[in-house]
């Protein structure tokens, strides 16, 4: 069950006439510092400070192989390709992402339920959690396009109706992330400022934005100010490594013009105490395979 935005205060205005920077109104780490869990106190402090937490090996090499095979099966299945949950690369016409992968695949559903994964999300968010979004991402070599700078929360707030910043994402590498093959970049500390973007949200904006971000894109001036203040960190790591990052981190990735493909599993956990209401700055909700309306906790 959802409510309308008339009952919820909009703490983070966006998609108006001008770009507006708003100081973060929410904690980063919602759980108690001494609560038991797989994340150490030092790592929780680093997450609070930087907005992200890198783990050298979250899953084993054998597990990486299992998930690689499942990714290959899904991305070569004609039925999956024809499904609206699959997003196709504009140039190559190859599958770029498959959404709601934890519902399509029992292999990835088990990963979501793994305590190494969901246990960290519960500890950070201080509550039970549900999956707001899941997907596999494939960035083939020789020209796969990147994704421009953005805050995920800006979109999830504006178009999905998440009221507060009580959401955490994990990107688990299924291939090696080099410093050359279009890896994830984050501005450390940027999660402490919400950059509300200028411009109204078109109807069915999601159809375009999943291939190339437009609405919800920060200005050059806003990005320059943030990058000058916070810097930019590029994430590299072996297959099986993972990056946890706060929903409001300013992040993006470049094109992959190398021969080396890059693929990952991306899971977004939201607190059951922060369930979606009506969109704060969009005419309609996005489809449920992008922004979940099933708030059943992961068990």
Curated annotation (Swiss-Prot):
Its cofactor is Fe(2+). It catalyses: L-ectoine + 2-oxoglutarate + O2 = 5-hydroxyectoine + succinate + CO2. 2-oxoglutarate binds at residue 139. It is an enzyme of class 1 (oxidoreductase). InterPro entries: EctD (IPR012774), Phytyl_CoA_dOase-like (IPR008775). Keywords: Dioxygenase, Iron, Metal-binding, Oxidoreductase. Its EC number is 1.14.11.55. Optimum pH is 7.5. Binds 1 Fe(2+) ion. Belongs to the PhyH family. EctD subfamily. Involved in the biosynthesis of 5-hydroxyectoine, called compatible solute, which helps organisms to survive extreme osmotic stress by acting as a highly soluble organic osmolyte. Catalyzes the 2-oxoglutarate-dependent selective hydroxylation of L-ectoine to yield (4S,5S)-5-hydroxyectoine. NCBIfam families: ectoine_ThpD. Homodimer. This is Ectoine dioxygenase. It comes from Streptomyces coelicolor (strain ATCC BAA-471 / A3(2) / M145). The gene is ectD.
């Amino acid at each position: 069950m959802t409510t309308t935005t008339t009952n919820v205060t909009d703490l983070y205005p966006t998609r108006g006439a001008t770009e507006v920077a708003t100081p973060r109104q929410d904690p980063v780490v919602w759980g108690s510092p001494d609560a038991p869990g797989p994340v150490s106190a030092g790592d929780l402090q680093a997450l609070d400070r930087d907005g992200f937490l890198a783990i050298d090996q979250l899953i084993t090499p054998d597990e990486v192989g299992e998930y690689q095979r499942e990714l290959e099966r899904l991305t070569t299945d004609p039925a999956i390709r024809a499904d609206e949950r699959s997003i196709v690369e504009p140039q190559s016409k190859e599958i770029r992402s498959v959404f709601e992968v934890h519902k399509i695949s029992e292999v990835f559903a088990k990963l979501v339920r793994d305590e190494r994964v969901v246990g960290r999300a519960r500890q950070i968010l201080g509550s039970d959690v549900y999956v707001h979004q899941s997907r596999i991402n494939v960035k083939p070599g020789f020209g796969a396009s990147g994704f421009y700078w953005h805050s995920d929360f800006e979109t999830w707030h504006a178009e999905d109706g998440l009221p507060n910043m009580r959401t955490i994402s994990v990107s688990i590498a299924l291939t090696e992330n080099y410093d050359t093959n279009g890896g994830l970049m984050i501005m450390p500390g940027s999660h402490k400022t919400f950059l509300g973007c200028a411009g109204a949200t078109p109807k069915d904006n999601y159809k375009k934005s999943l291939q190339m971000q437009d609405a919800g894109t920060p200005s050059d001036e806003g990005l320059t100010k943030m990058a000058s203040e916070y810097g930019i960190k590029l994430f590299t790591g072996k297959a099986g490594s993972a990056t946890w990052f706060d929903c409001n981190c300013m992040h993006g990735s470049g094109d992959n013009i190398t021969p080396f493909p890059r693929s990952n599993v991306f899971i977004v956990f939201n607190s059951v105490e922060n369930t979606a209401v009506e969109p704060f700055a969009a005419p309609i909700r996005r489809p449920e395979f992008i922004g979940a309306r099933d708030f059943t906790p992961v068990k």
